């Protein structure tokens, strides 16, 4: 059943991006830097960091829905001819009576003239820890990803555009605010999501809640939820608030001891707050071939659902969407998807080249009396059934583990089933991705007849995407699945493909209109 660490990590990234960012900037009210490449900086706006404080150490409590969940820590320091900016967030979250601690942090090192040198990102969930190091050169970025004792190395292009490092963005944004700017538009690179470029807009709204502060409303292209920040005269954020359907996430400036005390509680139970109860039981979903489900947002926002695999949708004249799930239906693989190497690549989460994963894939196929020349559909189903039986410890206690770790532990919930199946498929040369959304359960976490958050797998079979749920014992899929996002899971850090989940979590009502057996 459901895993929430991935989505909570995106919430963490939101805090990291908004409060202290690696940014590009373009602001019509003040000067705009004109450069030829991402390494050059010039002019008064983007110059060296002279005039900035050489040290800053800020701590925040973090709460969700009024419940303290943990802390956020930011540090800026000048170390000789280098500048280091560190951000870290630690949250403890309830999960159906249990609790999980999620920790994400990044450390960016640059030279005093603004040249990026290295960025290290760490993410920990339970006992699972991953680390990614980005080392910058003039033309590319060398990436080393480590998790579960294995390291994968690759190269990636440098992010395009005018590079502003953390020290520069702190100085420049503060300068524009002091100059009286009422709207600042800039571009940021989020270290926690693979140096993804994010467009951001910050608008002055008036006086803040905290004394002698100004409120700024910040929106960004990565996460569909705005954040309010109360900023003091020195440019420091005193309070930030992100409105979410499951409850506002609030960070408040405090002392280190106060921040660390706030993580002592079990945190808000996000599984409980995000489940959707049905007005009447619908157990027929588990055995049917087709279902039509009406989905509405509770706050009136437009809903975004993909048409992929078994799922299609259309507008509901009464509001929201009609979502149709047909177990026998597939969706054609687009030319872009066909050319996308990520669906066959190894990553920290889906390490299809791990010898243990390769061995499991071969064992699964041979135990079904198949081989590499057997039809793709038959091999895909054999792999799905194998994963269902292979993971014998089916619970919520396992952190978001990669396929390599699951191959050893035989433990996990829906996310571990999904990533292990995706890895086995790729080991057999079958392109795959992870699907995320909601699934019907007759009973879960003490509640009956609910839709709860869930992950499964999609595979390319004969030019089409098919849905495969490795948590099911009697069939490969059923129409009680609502798909919200798919992802290649090609990065050990945060995945922007799941950002749509944030605006949907806790913000929908669901009605089963009819079911066809």
PLM region descriptions:
Residues 26-33, 48-140, 144-158, 168-332, ...:
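Acidic, serine/threonine-rich low-complexity disordered tracts
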């Amino acid at each position: 059943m459901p895993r929430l660490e991935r989505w909570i990590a995106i919430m963490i990234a939101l805090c990291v991006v908004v409060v202290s960012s690696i940014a590009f900037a373009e602001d019509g009210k003040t000067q705009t830097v004109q450069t030829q490449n991402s390494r050059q900086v010039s002019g008064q706006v983007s110059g060296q960091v002279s005039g900035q404080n050489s040290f800053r150490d800020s701590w925040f409590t973090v709460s969700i829905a009024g419940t303290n969940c943990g802390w956020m820590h930011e540090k800026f320091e000048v170390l000789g001819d280098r500048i280091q900016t560190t951000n870290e967030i630690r949250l403890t979250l309830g999960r159906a009576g249990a609790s999980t601690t999620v920790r994400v942090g990044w450390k960016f090192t640059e030279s005093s003239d603004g040249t990026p040198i290295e960025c290290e990102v760490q993410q920990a969930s339970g006992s699972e820890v991953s680390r990614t190091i980005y080392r910058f050169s003039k033309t590319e970025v060398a990436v080393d990803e480590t998790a579960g004792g294995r390291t994968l190395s690759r190269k990636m292009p440098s992010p395009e555009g005018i590079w502003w490092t953390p020290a520069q963005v702190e100085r420049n944004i503060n300068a524009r605010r002091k100059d009286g700017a009422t709207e600042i538009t800039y571009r940021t690179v989020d270290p926690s999501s693979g140096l993804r470029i994010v467009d951001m807009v910050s608008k002055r709204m008036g006086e803040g809640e905290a004394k002698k502060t100004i409120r700024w409303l910040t929106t960004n292209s990565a996460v569909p939820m705005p954040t309010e920040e109360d900023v003091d005269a020195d440019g420091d954020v005193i309070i930030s608030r992100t409105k979410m359907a499951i409850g506002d996430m609030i960070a408040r400036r405090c002392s280190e001891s106060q921040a660390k005390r706030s993580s002592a509680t079990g945190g808000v139970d996000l599984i409980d707050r995000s489940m959707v109860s049905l007005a009447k039981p619908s157990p027929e979903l588990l055995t049917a071939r087709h279902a039509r489900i009406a989905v509405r947002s509770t706050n009136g926002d437009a809903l975004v659902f993909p048409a992929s695999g078994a799922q299609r949708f259309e507008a509901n004249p009464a509001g929201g969407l009609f979502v149709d799930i047909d177990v026998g239906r597939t969706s054609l693989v687009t030319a872009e998807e066909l050319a996308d190497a990520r669906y066959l690549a190894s990553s920290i989460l889906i390490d299809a080249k791990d010898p243990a994963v390769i061995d499991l894939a071969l064992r699964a196929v041979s135990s079904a009396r198949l081989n590499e020349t057997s039809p793709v559909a038959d091999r895909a189903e054999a792999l799905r059934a194998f994963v269902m039986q292979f993971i014998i410890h089916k619970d919520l206690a396992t952190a978001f583990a990669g396929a390599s770790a699951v191959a050893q532990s035989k433990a996990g919930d829906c996310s571990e089933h999904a990533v292990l199946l995706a890895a086995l498929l790729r080991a057999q040369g079958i392109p795959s991705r992870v699907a995320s959304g909601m699934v019907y359960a007759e009973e879960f976490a003490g509640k009956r007849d609910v839709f709860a958050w869930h992950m499964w797998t999609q595979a390319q079979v004969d030019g089409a995407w098919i849905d495969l749920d490795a948590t099911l014992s009697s069939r490969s899929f059923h129409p009680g699945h609502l798909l919200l996002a798919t992802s290649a899971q090609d990065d050990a850090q945060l995945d922007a493909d799941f950002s749509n989940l944030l605006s949907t979590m806790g913000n929908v009502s669901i009605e089963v209109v009819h079911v066809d057996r």
